[in-house]
Every structure is written in C-alpha cells, then in structure tokens.
Regions:
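Secondary-structure end/capping motifs
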Residues: 234-311
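Pocket-lining segment of extracytoplasmic ligand-binding domains
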Residues: 101, 174-175, 180-266
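Short, solvent-exposed loop/beta-turn-alpha elements that line the ligand-binding surface or hinge
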Residues: 63-71, 284-293, 316
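N-terminal secretory signal peptides
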Residues: 1-12, 19-27
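Extracytoplasmic/secreted envelope proteins and their assembly/folding machinery
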Residues: 59, 85, 89, 100-103, ...
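Conserved C-terminal helix/tail region of periplasmic/extracytoplasmic solute-binding proteins
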Residues: 305-334
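Short, glycine-/small- and polar/acidic-enriched structural segments
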Residues: 37-168, 173-176, 192-196, 212, ...
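Sec/Tat signal peptide C-region and signal peptidase I cleavage site
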Residues: 30-36
C-alpha cells in the first residue's frame, strides 16, 4: 500500500466480542435525536487513529459551514473503535471513527450504525512483542499473555492471525486493556505480546525497540466514519455537510503533511519520528466508500464467523450491505 506521503507526491468468545462491539444496548435516557428541526448541535469524535479528524477539529471547517445555520459543533475523543461505537450506540455522538470490521460487529450486535466515508486506508495494527521475547510468529502465542482491546481492529486482526496458525482465542491468555495500556503492559513485561494500534505501536517500535512480528496490511480493515442510522435518515443534509467538511480537511491534510504531523504531535505528545512512522502507514487518498471496503470488511466478517465470533446463522454479506451507505460519497465508489 502506498503511504500517505507517497500518494501526495504521486497525486498531490463470541458474546464477549459482540458485546464490546455493540456496547450498551440498553442505555436509559440516551439522547437519540431524529427530528432535524431539533438539531442545534452536531457531535463528532476525534481520534489519534483518524488523522483527518484532528485536522477537521483544528481548522474549524465544520464550524464555519454550520455557523450561519446556528448549529454548534461538539467534539469528543475516542480512544478506540470500541469507544466510538459505544458513544454512537448510546447517543453521545452523531458521527464516530472506527475500523470497518469493528463497525460490522457492532451492527451485527444491533448497534444501528452506517459507514458513510473512508477517512483512511491504514496499516494501523500488527502483532507486537519485545525484541527478547522469543516470539516470532502467531503460532508462538499459544499459552502466552496478549494485551488486546476487544471490539477493535487489533482484536479482529489477532483473531485472524491466531486462526491462520491453527489457534483460537482460548489457546492464548487475553488481557483486556485499552490500546495505550496494552503498550505499557508489553513494555513492562506484564504481557508477552500486544495487538497494537498506531500511533502507540509506532512509539513502542521507535522508543522501546518493540518488534512487529506479524504484519498483514490486507487484514487491516479501512478507517470509516460511522453515523447513527436514525440521524442520517432524519438529517441527510447535515450528513452531507459533515462529509464536505471532512473532504476539506482531507484535502488540506494531503497538501499540508507538516500540519497533520503537528496536530498529531500535539494530540499524542509523541515525537515527530513516531508520527512520521504512523503516517507512512496511512493512505488518505481514497475517501469514497463502496466495493473495496465492503470486500475487506466481508473477508474479516467471514473469518470471524468461522472462528465462532459471529453467529453461524448471520448472513455476513447482508450485514455488510446494511452497514455501508454510499449515498453520501464525495466521489465515485471504489
């Protein structure tokens, strides 16, 4: 996969995982909003795994677009796909950043989200270990302690890697932590491996000599922007406004990579070489959502179904069709 900067130069345990992906199905009193006339505030997340969201927040493109309509913008940080999907399901945000496969799991579990935009094509996850651990391949993880965040692309990546080695989750000892805590646990020696996520993964590589012992860019599902289905149905014009602002931010990011680096450094407090490593693995040039994303997400879904994570009676292809909504595409489907 060509990197973000390279493309600029060229073109300028089933229930547990499903529960984490869906998150909080029965939150009481959650402020779900369906009436367009009532919308006085659009609520989005920002995340260090979604560089475009940082540019959008910093530059104020959406605030400018909504100002004349008297609609405010509120930002909430998501620490992982699981958190973004939890916030969406609970009605705390209207738009959230997640991995495509994580969004599929959430929808299978009843979280009514639609994936409407591809903010990145990343290689943001891999399996990570210490350089002296003796772990060199997924088969070596049998009986080992692995830090992972349930309901996220790194978790799904781990399941698929274990599956490819003839192993299941039960053959290892999963330690459930948020991504940053997983890095800490690995470096302290509390776990043997970590299903990593950038930029924490890049930081562990550069600052602590951690080793990405298993990589598979094709098994990283796309970074997608999700919206609550009822919000999109009631407010299609606002969805288009958000996508247009995202496009403004994405175009700006490609033209101004130094600004993206500065925004990520400020948000993460990580040094520039770490952020450069993350961005080298991140392609921002394919925002239209469609066939390519569907194929990637469906492949992950079928693997998870084979592993027993998605129920056997679930029609994965139909679930993917229900997830991806191309109506708001900024350009042709890919």
């Amino acid at each position: 996969m060509m990197s973000f900067l390279g493309r600029r130069a060229a073109s300028l345990s089933r229930r547990a995982l499903l529960g984490a992906a869906g998150c909080t199905l029965f939150l009481i009193g959650a402020p779900h909003r369906a009436d367009a006339a009532e919308v006085k505030e659009v609520r989005l997340d920002w995340a260090t795994y979604n560089p475009v969201s940082l540019v959008l927040k910093e530059k104020g493109f959406l605030e400018a677009a909504l100002r004349e309509r008297g609609i405010a913008v509120r930002w909430t940080q998501s620490l992982g796909s699981n958190k973004a999907l939890e916030y969406l399901n609970g009605g705390a945000i209207d738009f959230g950043s997640s991995a495509g496969a994580a969004a599929l799991l959430a929808r299978v579990n009843g979280n009514p989200v639609k994936a409407i935009y591809a903010y990145s094509q990343p290689e943001w996850t891999a399996l990570v270990t210490r350089k002296d651990s003796g772990i060199a391949k997924p088969a070596d993880l049998k009986g080992k302690r692995i830090a992972v965040t349930r309901g996220t692309d790194p978790h799904i990546f781990l399941i698929r890697a274990l599956q490819g080695a003839g192993l299941a989750e039960r053959d290892a000892k999963l330690v459930l932590l948020q991504h940053a805590d997983g890095r800490t646990a690995l470096e302290r020696g509390d776990v043997d491996a970590w299903a990593g996520l950038d930029p924490m993964m890049a930081a562990s590589e550069i600052e602590n000599g951690s080793v990405l012992f298993f990589r598979d860019p094709a098994a990283n599902t796309w970074g997608v922007l999700d919206v609550r289905e009822d919000f999109a149905k009631a407010n299609p014009d606002l969805v288009r406004t958000v996508i247009a602002a995202y496009e403004e931010a994405r175009t700006y990011a490609i033209a101004n990579p130094d600004a993206v680096t500065r925004a990520l450094v400020a948000a993460t407090k990580l040094p520039e070489p770490v952020i450069a490593r993350q961005l080298a693995r991140t392609d921002l040039t394919r925002p239209a959502i469609g066939r390519v994303q569907a194929e990637s997400i469906q492949a992950a879904g079928l693997a998870l179904q084979q592993a027993g994570v998605i129920p056997p009676e679930t029609n994965v292809a139909s679930a993917v069709d229900g997830l991806i909504d191309t109506r708001f595409n900024p350009g042709p489907e890919r």
